Amino acid sequence: MGDSRETHGLNAFVTGYPVKHSRSPLIHGYWLRTLNLAGSYRAVEVTPDDFPAFIAALKDRSSGFVGGNVTIPHKEIAFKLADRPDELSEELGASNTLWLEDGLLHATNTDGRGFTANLDECHPGWDRTDRAVILGAGGASRAVIQAVRDRGVNEIHVVNRTVERAQELSDRFGAQVHAHPMAALGEVMRSAGLFVNTTSLGMENEVAPTIDFSPLAENAVVTDIVYVPLKTPLLAQAEEQGFATVDGLGMLLHQAAPGFETWFGKRPVVDEVLRALIIADMDKHR
């Protein structure tokens, strides 16, 4: 997606409803400063009713934006309104990154790339396993399943309270994705090398269940796409039981990088200074 376009005065956005909570302006603002670029990135709150008009203004360039990020609840409609959604978006039915190119609105979904880049950075070799367990079958699980499958994991077991939701994902992503009810969690965890929580269990004000991680492979990695709190109860449990853990903040940071490079023409770096900046903001808003 990257190119060498002139970066003076380019403007990008994040839109959602609501969008006040988004930390994307902090992330992209940091990269603009450290790379000494003249562009801007800001949050624009758009209601579902107004979203088609927002996209129309983006397409005809009257909005002044070259592209941007899309968050809840607009990801599905952004995919539908794009002129050129890529294969990742097509399979997911949702897009989180938009950009104008040759007069057309292109779309992709970088959530899966953010997920795998976080694991690559924090626990290289995580993808040597043949078996992964994904807890949850909501919208957030789709990109994770897609990314894990595309990295060559042969068996992906989706466990959900409502097994029908998990079955829908199995139908969408192919024969190597298997659906299970919560009662089967312990059984499907046997010898799995990756455990991913994609649910809100363990978020602030959420009571997390106690999970016995011992059926996992000895060198398994447990990760959570939730990053508030940074160490969720599920990660704390896994750590106490001797397993390697990876928090979800890196996914947020890494999923932002492809879009930035597309809009501003420079590849940003996810570093410890950026991570500390976001953690400080999280602490401030507790």
From Swiss-Prot:
Pathway: Metabolic intermediate biosynthesis; chorismate biosynthesis; chorismate from D-erythrose 4-phosphate and phosphoenolpyruvate: step 4/7. The keyword Oxidoreductase applies. Its EC number is 1.1.1.25. GO terms for cellular component: cytosol. One of its GO terms (biological process) is chorismate biosynthetic process. InterPro entries: Aminoacid_DH-like_N_sf (IPR046346), NAD(P)-bd_dom_sf (IPR036291), SDH_C (IPR041121), Shikimate_DH (IPR011342), Shikimate_DH-bd_N (IPR013708), Shikimate_DH_fam (IPR022893), Shikm_DH/Glu-tRNA_Rdtase (IPR006151). One of its GO terms (molecular function) is NADP binding. Shikimate binds at S22, R23, S24, T71, N96, D111, Y227. It catalyses: shikimate + NADP(+) = 3-dehydroshikimate + NADPH + H(+). Keywords: Amino-acid biosynthesis, Aromatic amino acid biosynthesis, NADP, Oxidoreductase. The keyword Oxidoreductase applies. Homodimer. HAMAP family: Shikimate_DH_AroE. This is Shikimate dehydrogenase (NADP(+)). It comes from Rhizobium rhizogenes (strain K84 / ATCC BAA-868) (Agrobacterium radiobacter).
